[in-house]
Amino acid sequence: MLLHIVARGRIGRGPEADLVDRYIKRIGWPTRITELPDSGGRLPPRDPGTVLVMLDEKGEQLGSMAFAEKLGRWRDDGRREVRFLIGAADGFDEAQRREADLLFAFGKATWPHLLARAMLAEQLWRATSILAGHPYHREG
C-alpha cells in the first residue's frame, strides 16, 4: 500500500527536510511525497481505492496505536493508497473536509507546515514499525 503525502508549499533544504527524509527512508512501505504550490496546482487524480486523510485542526486525535490500527485495517482491506493532505496556511474548507475519509489532528495546537510534515513522517514510521512488530514504539 502506497503512503502518499501531498503537501502545500515547498520544504526546501534544512533541518526539517532532513528529519522528513530520515523517517521516510525508514518506512518499509512504498512512500511518495508530492509538493504543490501554496495556492493553485492540482491534486494528483484519486483512484476509487484511495483513502483520503486530511491533517486538520478539527480532526480526530489518534494515539500511535490507534493510527497504526487504521493503517493496518486499510492495508488488510486491500486499499492501494492512503493519501495524506497537508493544506495551505488557511487549511481546508468544509467542502474539502467532507471529501476526507479521515480528518486527523496532531492535538489542538496549530503546527507549522514543515513540522507537521516531519511529525506525519515520524508517525508513519512509528505506525508501520508497530505493524511489523518492531520495538521502536513503547506504549506506556
Swiss-Prot record:
It catalyses: pseudouridine(1915) in 23S rRNA + S-adenosyl-L-methionine = N(3)-methylpseudouridine(1915) in 23S rRNA + S-adenosyl-L-homocysteine + H(+). Its main location: cytoplasm. GO terms for cellular component: cytoplasm. Transmembrane segments: none annotated. SUPFAM superfamilies: alpha/beta knot. It comes from the Bacteria. It is an enzyme of class 2 (transferase). InterPro entries: Alpha/beta_knot_MTases (IPR029028), RlmH-like (IPR003742), tRNA_m1G_MTases_N (IPR029026). Keywords: Cytoplasm, Methyltransferase, rRNA processing, S-adenosyl-L-methionine, Transferase. Specifically methylates the pseudouridine at position 1915 (m3Psi1915) in 23S rRNA. Homodimer. This is Ribosomal RNA large subunit methyltransferase H.
